[in-house]
């Protein structure tokens, strides 16, 4: 079993986007700590299974970030369950989770499942619009969400999600200073090694996603920038 607490760099692959076999091999052999499969829309059991089978040809740990209960399948090493803490809709905080537990609770392997406390901070992002996230928040608000995840809910992961835009480094630094047990994941807008390295100063885990589809070489350079290997 892998130890997610030591992961510094992960790639996130969207099953609804095209990725060549050659580029997938580059991602999986890059030295990244894990590959997360997940997206905000167009996620189906078929494209998740296709992605799983493709990634399983390699030794890299593989995580399904669950956005649709209908697209859950066995075979992943871990399952990340996002709870959007700044959503205005309860369904994205605990609602869909309750439904999933009602349907699948008896067969879940709890050692493979980790809850993520999301704070979505880009109002233009698909995930923000889907979940009706309250993105016009102050730093104090974000710190409070971090405390909620870390100290009240005792979640293993607090995820700052800028999704498509590069975030506020000072805010990431201040959030990290508040967390005692939760690991801080940062995702959003990383387009080069310098940005990845900058966020890695404070985030426990840097998530690199969109740049994979725009500039594979730049994406691959983020691994060494974060891990320093």
Curated annotation (Swiss-Prot):
Query: Oligomeric state and partners?
Result: Homodimer.
UniProt GO BP: glycerophospholipid biosynthetic process
Q: Which cofactor does it need?
A: Mg(2+)
CDD domains for the chain: PcrB_like
Please state the Enzyme Commission number of this protein: 2.5.1.n9
Q: Where does Mg(2+) bind?
A: 14, 40
Function, as annotated, reads: Prenyltransferase that catalyzes in vivo the transfer of the heptaprenyl moiety of heptaprenyl pyrophosphate (HepPP; 35 carbon atoms) to the C3 hydroxyl of sn-glycerol-1-phosphate (G1P), producing heptaprenylglyceryl phosphate (HepGP). This reaction is an ether-bond-formation step in the biosynthesis of archaea-type G1P-based membrane lipids found in Bacillales.
| Superkingdom of origin organism | Bacteria
Q: In which pathway does it act?
A: Membrane lipid metabolism; glycerophospholipid metabolism
Give GO terms: molecular function aspect only: heptaprenylglyceryl phosphate synthase activity; magnesium ion binding
Q: Which residues cross the membrane?
A: none
State the similarity comment: Belongs to the GGGP/HepGP synthase family. Group I subfamily.
Query: What are the protein's UniProt keywords?
Result: Lipid biosynthesis, Lipid metabolism, Magnesium, Metal-binding, Phospholipid biosynthesis, Phospholipid metabolism, Transferase
The reply on keyword GTP-binding is no
Tell me which InterPro entries the record gives. GGGP/HepGP_synthase_I (IPR039074), GGGP/HepGP_synthase_sf (IPR038597), GGGP_HepGP_synthase (IPR008205)
Q: Name it.
A: Heptaprenylglyceryl phosphate synthase
Positions that bind sn-glycerol 1-phosphate:
12, 159-164, 189, 209-210
* Catalytic reaction equation(s): sn-glycerol 1-phosphate + all-trans-heptaprenyl diphosphate = 3-heptaprenyl-sn-glycero-1-phosphate + diphosphate
């Amino acid at each position: 079993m892998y130890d997610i607490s030591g992961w510094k760099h992960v790639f996130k692959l969207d099953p609804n986007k095209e990725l060549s076999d050659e580029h997938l091999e580059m991602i999986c052999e890059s030295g990244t700590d894990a590959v997360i499969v997940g997206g905000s829309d167009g996620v189906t059991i078929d494209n998740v299974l296709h992605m799983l089978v493709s990634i399983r040809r390699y030794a890299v740990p593989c995580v399904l970030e669950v956005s649709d209960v209908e697209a859950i399948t066995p075979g992943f090493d871990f399952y990340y369950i996002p709870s959007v803490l700044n959503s205005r809709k309860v369904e994205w905080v605990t609602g869909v989770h309750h439904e999933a537990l009602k349907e699948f609770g008896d067969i879940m392997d709890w050692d493979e499942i980790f809850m993520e406390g999301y704070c979505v901070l880009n109002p233009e992002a698909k995930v923000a619009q889907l979940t009706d996230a309250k993105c016009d928040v102050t730093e104090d608000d974000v710190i409070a969400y971090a405390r909620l995840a870390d100290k009240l809910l005792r979640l293993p992961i607090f995820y700052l999600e800028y999704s498509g835009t590069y975030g506020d480094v000072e805010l990431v630094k201040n959030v990290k200073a508040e967390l005692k047990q939760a690991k801080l994941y940062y995702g959003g807008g990383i387009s080069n090694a310098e940005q990845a390295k900058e966020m890695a100063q404070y985030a426990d885990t840097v998530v690199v996603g969109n740049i994979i589809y725009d500039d594979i070489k730049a994406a691959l350079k983020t691994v060494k920038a974060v891990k320093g290997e």
